[in-house]
């Protein structure tokens, strides 16, 4: 990272290299500080599952974390050296508690710049293959993290970083997502997310110690 090596001392870089070598490409669970570090230096690649029923309702999950609260399209970060199909299956189990039928091709690509970082999501259409193992709430019942609810239209209290899914659902309703996967973008939060390109460069690649 020419011109920015001074951001980390030689000792800190050596420590970081040692930590990365210990992970050994296993996609292991990352400690929170290391996960935050990853989010600060690269974009994460995710899968999102847009589950709809025969009536066109969409199934959303309640999220409540330091970056906001609201209903969101369930998704998951692809682990290192993990195939997309495996992550789609894991996401379905984790978020819905049941299997889902997932379309082979992504219906949209969604990039989000927020206070957490920068994510690029492959959004796939999906339908449930069973009864969700997570709690389904209806009416005015107060949701808790992980609860699911069917919506005929995107609710007013969408998770702040998922407001872009209003555009995705509207485009899907007009039949505009049947022939490809267009890009949808959202900028949200206090950080400067409007930069088109990062500063600096990446130094020559080298094997981990």
Identify the residue ranges that each predicted region occupies:
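Conserved hydrophobic/aromatic beta-strand scaffold that supports enzyme active sites
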Residues: 50, 60, 123-125, 150
């Amino acid at each position: 990272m020419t011109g920015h090596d001074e951001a980390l001392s030689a000792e800190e870089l050596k420590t970081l290299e040692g930590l990365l070598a210990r992970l050994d490409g296993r996609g292991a669970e990352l400690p929170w500080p290391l996960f935050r570090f990853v989010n600060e230096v690269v974009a994460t690649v995710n899968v999102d599952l847009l589950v709809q029923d025969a009536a066109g309702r969409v199934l959303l999950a309640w999220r409540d974390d330091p970056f906001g609260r609201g209903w969101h399209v369930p998704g998951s970060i692809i682990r290192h050296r993990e195939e997309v199909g495996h992550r789609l299956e894991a996401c379905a189990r984790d978020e819905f508690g049941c299997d889902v039928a997932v379309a082979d091709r992504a219906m949209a690509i969604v990039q989000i710049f927020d206070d957490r970082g920068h994510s690029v999501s492959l959004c796939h259409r999906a339908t449930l293959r069973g009864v969700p193992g997570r709690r389904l709430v209806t009416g005015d019942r107060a949701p808790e993290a992980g609860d699911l609810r069917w919506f005929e239209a995107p609710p007013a209290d969408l998770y702040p970083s998922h407001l872009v899914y209003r555009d995705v659902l509207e485009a899907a309703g007009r039949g505009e997502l049947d022939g490809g996967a267009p890009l949808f973008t959202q900028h949200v939060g206090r950080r400067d997310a409007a930069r088109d390109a990062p500063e600096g460069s990446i130094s020559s690649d080298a094997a981990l110690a």
